[in-house]
UniProtKB/Swiss-Prot annotation:
Family statement: Belongs to the methyltransferase superfamily. RsmC family.
GO MF term list: 16S rRNA (guanine(1207)-N(2))-methyltransferase activity; nucleic acid binding
HAMAP family xref list: 16SrRNA_methyltr_C
Gene3D superfamilies xrefs: Vaccinia Virus protein VP39 (3.40.50.150)
Protein species of origin: Acinetobacter baumannii (strain AYE)
GO cellular component, one term: cytoplasm
Reaction catalysed by this enzyme: guanosine(1207) in 16S rRNA + S-adenosyl-L-methionine = N(2)-methylguanosine(1207) in 16S rRNA + S-adenosyl-L-homocysteine + H(+)
EC assignment: 2.1.1.172
Stated role: Specifically methylates the guanine in position 1207 of 16S rRNA in the 30S particle.
Name of this protein: Ribosomal RNA small subunit methyltransferase C
Keyword annotations from UniProtKB, A to Z: Cytoplasm, Methyltransferase, rRNA processing, S-adenosyl-L-methionine, Transferase
Length: 337
């Protein structure tokens, strides 16, 4: 069990009524809470959501707060400070004064910094410190008036092969305020990508998807991501750039296995973070299994840190892998099915 969940169980006597677990890990916590606790989960991680659904735990996959009413909320601290600001805002706009909010997180995950954000809304108290985690309690004294989701957007412009794109990114989305180096290295090669049905695996704020859609109005883009905030950001990026929704297929995925088949191309700056931890499972799975989702002569385009062994993985499954460039610590890799 996740150590943060263990800390919650140690202090379960504080819980009562309808309790919303926000950003909770997919473990046995809910099943081990007392039966009188009516617990449900709000998550934006599709893999976690599927896990909760499979175990019969009431779960809500969205960027928005659930529509039900709750007596308490437990926030598992996210990696992003901006995302925590958003979560705190929506919690304080849905709960009432004198209700309880709990904040739990790992010390190395910034729980003490998060507690300082929490104290903007009332008196806080540290309830526990164990398993390299802390649990804080807030009695709500100040509630918020809900702000529209669009007010949380960060936008910036990107020049790609003579086109200017406006990128929209919600809190917690990779490279929310600027173009990351890996994608910048990949962008000049996007005009070589085969047209047709194209998947952007780990679409983030939709930079790759948006360029490919704008470059050819006949392209159909399957924007794939595990994160609801990324999918919502991609949809907003398309709208901001005047690209019709008929070119966009948004799809939450747990990995490449959930992707459509018979694709003309898969393009990716693959994800490698899960919360505060590094996890290469999704990107390694992409290298190993992308061919199953491509048509004959379909293309795989990946940008990745040069120290990763992806060329070997791709060559093993495609029979070849071409390194298009090696620049600023990143390689652009190409293979044809």
């Amino acid at each position: 069990m996740d150590p943060r969940s263990e800390v919650i169980l140690r202090q379960q006597d504080y819980l009562k009524g309808r309790v919303l677990l926000i950003n909770a890990p997919n473990d046995a916590l809910v099943s081990q809470l007392p039966t009188e606790i009516d617990a449900s989960v709000w998550t934006w991680n599709y893999a976690d959501y599927q896990g909760f659904v499979n175990t019969g735990t009431p779960a809500h996959f969205s960027v928005e707060f659930p529509s039900q009413e709750f007596d308490q909320a437990i926030i598992f601290v996210p990696k992003s400070k901006e995302l925590l600001n958003y979560i705190l805002h929506v919690v304080m706009s849905h709960l009432k004064t004198d209700q309880s909010v709990f904040l739990v997180g790992e010390k190395k995950g910034g729980v003490e910094r998060a507690a300082k954000q929490l104290q903007n809304f009332g008196t806080i108290l540290k309830l526990d410190s164990a398993r390299h985690c802390q649990l804080w309690h807030l009695k709500i004294e100040k509630i918020e008036k809900i702000k529209p989701l669009e007010s949380w957007l960060k936008t910036y412009t990107v020049q790609v092969n003579g086109q200017e794109l406006t990128i929209c990114a919600l809190p917690g989305v990779f490279s929310q305020t600027h173009l990351d180096v890996g994608t910048a290295v990949l962008l000049p090669y996007l005009n070589q990508v085969k047209s047709g049905r194209i998947a952007d695996f780990g679409c983030g704020a939709g930079i790759i998807s948006c360029y490919l859609a704008k470059a050819n109005s006949s392209n159909i883009i399957h924007a794939l991501d595990i994160d609801a905030f990324a999918l919502q950001s991609t949809e907003m990026t398309f709208s901001r750039n005047g690209i019709g929704s008929d070119q966009l297929r948004l799809q939450p995925v747990t990995g490449i296995a959930d992707a459509p088949t018979e694709l003309d191309a898969i393009v990716s700056n693959p994800p490698f973070h899960q919360g505060i931890h590094t996890n290469y499972d999704a990107s390694e799975g992409l290298c190993q299994n992308a061919k199953k989702h491509l048509k004959a002569s379909g293309e795989l385009w990946i940008v990745a840190n040069r120290f990763l062994n992806y060329p070997i993985l791709i060559e093993k499954h495609f029979g070849q892998c071409e390194i298009k460039t090696d620049l600023q610590g990143f390689k652009v890799l190409y293979a044809c099915a």
